[in-house]
Amino acid sequence: YKPSLTLSGSKSFEDTNKLTNQSGGDASINDVEPLTKSIKLEQNLLDFNRGITHKRNIIGLDLASAKLIKKEQDIFYEAIEAYTQLILARETLDINKSNLDLLSRQVENDQIRLDRGQITITDLSQSESSFAGAQAQFIEAKNDLLISKLTYENIIGEIKDPNSLQKKSTAIVNIPETLNDAISISKRKNPDILIAKFELDQTKKDLESSKADLIPTASLSLERSYSDDVSSTIDEREKDTLTTTLSWPFYSGGKKRSTISKNANLTSRKRLLLDDTIQTNETKVTSAWSSLESSKSFLDSVKVQVKAAKIANEGIVAEYERGSRTTLD
């Protein structure tokens, strides 16, 4: 609602070709070259639409900020996934290489034991079959590592040695204590919900703006003008003009009413989209929380299984070396 100040000027050149009086005779021609300069100060007294537009623009900035946060989160997620997948591919390749070396030694050992008559040809074939399978898995792991490396470089940047990546299990964010806490935090900070809220607020302002188009507006202006060579009888003129303007666009062929109806329907649609986004968010948070808890339980179970498998493997290796257990067993 700040006033506006306008400076203007004009210069006219006259060239009268013919001028007659009432009796039909020629009249004297006195052309002038008027010069006008003016300064005008204008203040809007009543304009609801300007305030609504200002508030809508502020909401637009908040909406852009929420979209930026969402984009950042998407990039963070892709970066974390690329990082962990490359580590997984590297570890998988190391495991398959160790397994391949182990089975290679086992084939050599079984060949010697077969020559000594300690095992049968079936045992050797079983070892060779396992070795062939390990070779296929090793090649697949190498390809997975190459793909993971390319994905990492595409998202994060160049990396020369995948072994330089460190394994860290510490979360980069604080995990909520309960599911309800997680849902509550997501309702406040989830970018999708924030975007839906800001879009709803924008449509509300659009509806208010369309209604404001039917509300009267008022303005007040003060203009001072200076004129030289005004006419053949007037040389200079200085004039002050005070103007009050009231405008009320109460009818425009139904166009404004149609715009109001359109924005009202759009507001209802955005409100439904917000409700759907909130429900979808709660479902996703619940699913993510369940997956996290299941992963924790699964990890604990795997640790116990690995510990038991190590003990069992030591016994099996000892029996195998003594000859009391065959390769097929």
Model-inferred region functions:
Residues 1-10, 16, 43-44, 58, ...:
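Bacterial Sec-pathway N-terminal export signals of envelope proteins
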Residues 1-4, 16, 38-56, 66-73, ...:
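A glycine-/polar-enriched beta->alpha junction
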Residues 6-43, 166-176, 208, 221-259:
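Small/polar, glycine/serine/threonine/aspartate-rich low-complexity segments that form flexible
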Residues 34-38, 81, 126, 181, ...:
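Transmembrane beta-barrel architecture of outer-membrane proteins
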Residues 58, 121-130, 261, 327-329:
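Short, charged, amphipathic alpha-helical segments
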Residues 71-97, 105-107, 111-112, 148, ...:
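Amphipathic alpha-helical coiled-coil segments
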Residues 74-187, 199, 288-291, 295, ...:
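Periplasmic alpha-helical coiled-coil/stalk elements that build and connect Gram-negative outer-membrane
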